[in-house]
């Protein structure tokens, strides 16, 4: 499309029609007698796109795969989107559902403190970190 300033919608429509027909004709063999019909068809098609028809969309709220209460088990968390069981939901939500934990909590009306990690898994990781000495201040070397 050219970089000209358009006065109104009709000028834009004519400009777009010309650009589309020119691009089409440069790559296809079109007899001269069919050119007015092609221009008319493209113009008509573009005219129909300027006023979108109003469509009433009735979207039902998605139902969770399991109840929120049953989704948090000691050894796993069940994804409300697909019903899969996981120790940690964050990576699954990102890769399979393109959601952040915040978006997930908002979609399913979950509490801000709804866990993204199974309780037993969180406890095991915490225990391992404490055994390694993480979270403690270093002793001064003197």
Curated annotation (Swiss-Prot):
Belongs to the ros/MucR family. GO terms for biological process: regulation of DNA-templated transcription. The keyword Cell wall biogenesis/degradation does not apply. The gene is rosAR. Gene3D superfamilies: ROS/MUCR transcriptional regulator protein. Keywords: DNA-binding, Metal-binding, Transcription, Transcription regulation, Zinc, Zinc-finger. GO terms for molecular function: DNA binding; zinc ion binding. It comes from the Bacteria. InterPro entries: ROS/MUCR_sf (IPR041920), ROS_MUCR (IPR008807). The keyword DNA-binding applies. This is Transcriptional regulatory protein rosAr. A zinc finger (C2H3-type) spans 79-97.
